[in-house]
Curated annotation (Swiss-Prot):
It comes from the Bacteria. GO terms for biological process: positive regulation of translation. It is a peripheral membrane protein. Belongs to the TRAFAC class translation factor GTPase superfamily. Classic translation factor GTPase family. LepA subfamily. It holds the Pfam family LepA_C. GTP binds at residues 14-19, 131-134. It is found in: Cell inner membrane. Residues 2-184 form the tr-type G domain. Its EC number is 3.6.5.n1. This is Elongation factor 4. Keywords: Cell inner membrane, Cell membrane, GTP-binding, Hydrolase, Membrane, Nucleotide-binding, Protein biosynthesis. GO terms for cellular component: plasma membrane. HAMAP family: LepA.
Amino acid sequence: MSHIRNFSIIAHIDHGKSTLADRFIQMCGGLSEREMEAQVLDSMDLERERGITIKAHSVTLYYKAKDGITYQLNFIDTPGHVDFTYEVSRSLAACEGALLVVDAGQGVEAQSVANCYTAIEQGLEVMPVLNKMDLPQADPDRVKEEIEKIIGIDATDAVACSAKSGMGVDEVLERLVATIPPPTGDIEAPLQALIIDSWFDNYLGVVSLVRVRHGRVKKGDKILVKSTGKLHLVDSVGVFNPKHSATVDLKAGEVGFIIAGIKDIHGAPVGDTLTLSTTPDVDVLPGFKRIQPQVYAGLFPVSSDDFEDFREALQKLTLNDSSLQYSPESSDALGFGFRCGFLGMLHMEIIQERLEREYNLDLITTAPTVIFELLLKTGETIYVDNPSKLPDLSAIEDMREPIVRANILVPQEHLGNVITLCIEKRGVQHDMLFLGTQVQVSYDLPMNEVVLDFFDRLKSVSRGYASLDYHFDRYQSANLVKLDVLINGEKVDALALIVHRDNAHYKGRALTEKMKELIPRQMFDVAIQAAIGGQIVARTTVKALRKNVLAKCYGGDVSRKRKLLEKQKAGKKRMKQVGNVEIPQEAFLAVLRLE
């Protein structure tokens, strides 16, 4: 036990977590030269393409330290993106320590601060590491000062290394073995194991990644899942080094996988406790708080035949990504689909892309919305996540929108732009701290504004230097209205938006203009209108294509020409009454990209 170290790596996006993980694997001989490739742990295609870590990955390595003892290192590479904080908090629950990796050129960023606080709250030992020391712009002294000022942990003897060139990595491992405490637990006690993550394998059933707190588990044991009360027979146990490798057993303090032929997708939920069937009254370990989705959007299969496949794909994905929630919904314009809850826009894009790639589905997404709290005149409070479910305005006493507390870290020279952006998004400044060359501003912003494009805009006004971390704070009354889009006088439910009254005219105009570009021209005029209640606030028309019916007339009598034109006009009028307009997929997403 005293030779085991469990730790995870926390850092902001692009500060070199995954590269550092590669170096660890290389130094401890986890893979042969041939199998070694950049970012070994980012195994999903999507992760490699976007260069981000989405899922937390676990690896077990054996490191022979300078004192001659071989240590077993179980480490978990975690995502750095604000949308995946949940993955991080789960990984931390399985560890005794964390490496805080900071880019020595860029300094501390908002995301590392947030994840670091999570680690300190869970009582982990945090060890700062300065990465990218081989870069010319590295400034270790300034960064150490920032770590002390912003996060408040002692960084005077932070290890300096460069994961790319491999400089100082052995020093990191030595320091790690010395500072991070070994796990506590009793091998002889009854089995108690926490499920950190699980995924579905078509051949093996549910594979669970577990951290064993007490006792041991081996092949052939009967295990009991505490929340479902079901018994399963263990087929195999083992660790990732980084490949699957089976071991005899998993003992207290270790992190590894258990395969027990569970075929039911909800058979081993994340955050659950496993024990042996002989000791069913073991205490349940404190799991993780269920995270509430912040953004909701409708996902619909393009062809309605795919609906069942889509449901199955969602079930399998929910197992692997427990922060995704979904419920069936139907729309007049799009047929049957699901209303899904996500943690943020990036999460939504990733899920949609994973569904399309891994399960070969064609999907249409509607504009994302947040949850609104409504107080009805009857005195009851309801929560609405879908604009088309909004009750009549006359029945509503008060509408409240979710407000987030956003912490933004930005270099001083970009501060003005960031403040302008926050004001434009109806933000209220809460506090401002000057820390060295950086400023930490905190704002209360309506989540509705943050969800759509705030992150991208923030990056562009600050040339990529600002970083953002936000969390839900409260609901607050606001003057909100529902903006409907009518195409040829018919409401399209999938295009409705809930907006602030002050922005409603502007949003309506922008939306109709955008739709005009995207809806293809028909043989008749198509009117696109934006309405608040019964009042039309904006209108554009997609002009009809018309055939020149007078082409064959040459000279001739005006009454002949008039007859042909009247006939064309009558035809167009008839067409307009029965014609319906196909709305392309881009039009539904136009709502996202309103400047």
